[in-house]
Each structure stands twice: as C-alpha cells, then as structure tokens.
C-alpha cells in the first residue's frame, strides 16, 4: 500500500483491535493480507520496464497534493507523469490550483476530461491549464491514458487521478463508458 495515510489507517485499526483484546500476533500476521480500497492509491500495473501505473480518486487540491507527495516518497522512480481533469458543475476555483499542484510535483502533466457534466469540457481544461501551461491537453480520456502509457520510461510512475476505479464519464445527462 502506498501513502502515509495508509500507514495511519493500519496503525489506528490495529490499535483498536488490540484495545478490544484481540491477539496482537494474529493482528500483525494479517497485515500482509491488507489491500487498499479500490481506486485509492491503487497500483494497476507494473510494466516490463518497471514503470508503475497508479490510480487514485484525488479530485481536490488537498487530495492531489497528498497523492503526489506520497508518490515522491517511492524510492527509485525516475519521472512522475500525472494525468487528471476536473469535474464540471463543481468548484471552479480549484481547477487552476490543481494545475499548479500537478505542475509542481510532476515531470509531465496531461490534462483530460473528467465528468464534464453540463459544462463545456474545453472551458474546464482551459482553467486547469492556466495553472500548468506546459501540460499536454488531450480531451478524450482513453486517448490521454494511452498517450501517458506510451510516454512511460524505465522506473517512471504514472498517476491517473480524479476517477479512482470509475469507468464512466458523466457528460450532460448521460453516463458514458
């Protein structure tokens, strides 16, 4: 599991179990079987060249900062590639800030669509890009992910942020695969 928050959660859970009188040896043996919640700093795959692909729900400035700081702590990673977008009909003030955060903690930033809902996707991306003007803009999320994966080199790390394990896009009143 990746991230300090995961450690904090495990320590808190183990402490509660011990306080309830559970066998501490059994608790510590079971730690090796823990898995993160789907879509929360979830390692999707490791490529042949040892690049990692991680997905996370990070859709707020604080969550994106936390995810990227956690990723920076992974030893032996060359570059961090971050792919994300911001949802439509939501807090517009966070878009530029999230672009700035991605720009600060990433070597490559790719901005794409993420549930534009009833807003013009190009406007959402434009607001994000105002915080990371050197980012690559690829509206279609599938194409953006394929592009990001094609950029992976040995020991790189790709963070696909914002949607966690969701496999749909909310566009207007439709939910598309």
Where are these regions (language model features)?
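ATP-dependent carboxylate-amine ligase
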Residues: 12-177
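C-terminal accessory "lid"/substrate-recognition subdomains
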Residues: 5-6, 35
């Amino acid at each position: 599991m990746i991230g300090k928050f995961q450690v904090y959660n495990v320590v808190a859970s183990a402490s509660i179990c011990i306080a309830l009188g559970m066998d501490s040896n059994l608790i510590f043996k079971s730690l090796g079987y823990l898995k993160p919640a789907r879509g929360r700093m979830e390692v999707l795959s490791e490529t042949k060249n040892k690049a990692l692909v991680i997905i996370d729900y990070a859709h707020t400035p604080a969550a994106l900062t936390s995810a990227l700081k956690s990723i920076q702590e992974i030893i032996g990673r060359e570059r961090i590639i971050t792919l994300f977008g911001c949802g439509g009909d939501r807090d517009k003030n966070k878009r530029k800030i999230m672009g700035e955060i991605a720009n600060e903690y990433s070597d490559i930033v790719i901005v794409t669509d993420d549930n534009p809902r009833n807003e013009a996707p190009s406007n959402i991306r434009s607001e994000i890009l105002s915080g990371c003007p050197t980012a690559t803009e690829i509206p279609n999320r599938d194409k953006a992910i394929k592009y990001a994966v094609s950029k992976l080199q040995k020991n790189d790390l790709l963070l696909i942020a914002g949607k966690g394990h969701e496999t749909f896009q909310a566009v207007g009143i439709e939910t598309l695969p």
